[in-house]
């Protein structure tokens, strides 16, 4: 079974869940395609897609397994677990998404908050942004499932509701009755649902 997902989801949530699934279902072979590019399930480039999206393609079937929430994070040593109102963070350096990352919601939010003036460092992946803030006093927006599980970081704000994005597990309609696909989407869907509740 070929599964496609993003690097951030794989590193932050799925690697552990996939390993558990492999232990419980040793006869199902997993091939994981880690890419921020959307692979075509209709062309059978993958059997299952696990993707954050507000608008899943109508040609696919699946279910929303939760909502990815995002907050502002900073390096724990520098911030010492201090919460800060967002408006006070505009005086600090920000790390933002590069346009090639394709995170239009975050780009728009940062522009609307006037944060582009204090953002002189841009990275084209969430994992890159996470790594970059570990090195200094800058702040950035990260999915809570990444930031909360990184002991070197601390959350500085509440979750930013306008950056919430649904997480979907999707497959081609012709595959939805295939037993291994049903088992995988059921088990991994439940794991993700639980993980996102606590993130």
Where are these regions (language model features)?
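Residue-level recognition of oxygen-bearing side chains
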Residues: 8, 128, 183
């Amino acid at each position: 079974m070929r599964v496609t997902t993003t690097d951030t989801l794989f590193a932050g949530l799925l690697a552990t869940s996939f390993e558990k699934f492999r232990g419980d279902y040793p006869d199902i072979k997993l091939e994981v395609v880690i890419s921020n590019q959307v692979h075509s399930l209709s062309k059978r480039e993958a059997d299952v897609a696990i993707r954050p999206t507000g608008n899943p393609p109508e040609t696919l079937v699946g279910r929303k397994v939760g909502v990815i929430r995002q907050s502002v994070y900073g390096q724990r040593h520098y911030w010492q677990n201090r919460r800060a109102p967002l408006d006070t963070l505009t005086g600090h350096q920000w790390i933002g998404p590069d346009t090639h990352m394709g995170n239009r919601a975050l780009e728009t939010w940062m522009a609307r908050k006037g944060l582009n003036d204090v953002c002189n460092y841009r990275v084209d992946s969430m994992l890159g942004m996470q790594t970059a803030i570990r090195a200094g006093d800058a702040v950035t927006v990260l999915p809570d499932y990444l930031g909360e599980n990184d002991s070197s970081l601390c959350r500085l704000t509440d979750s930013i509701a306008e950056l919430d994005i649904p997480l979907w597990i999707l497959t081609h309609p012709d595959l939805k009755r295939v037993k291994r696909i049903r088992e995988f989407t059921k088990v991994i869907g439940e794991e993700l649902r639980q993980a996102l509740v606590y993130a």
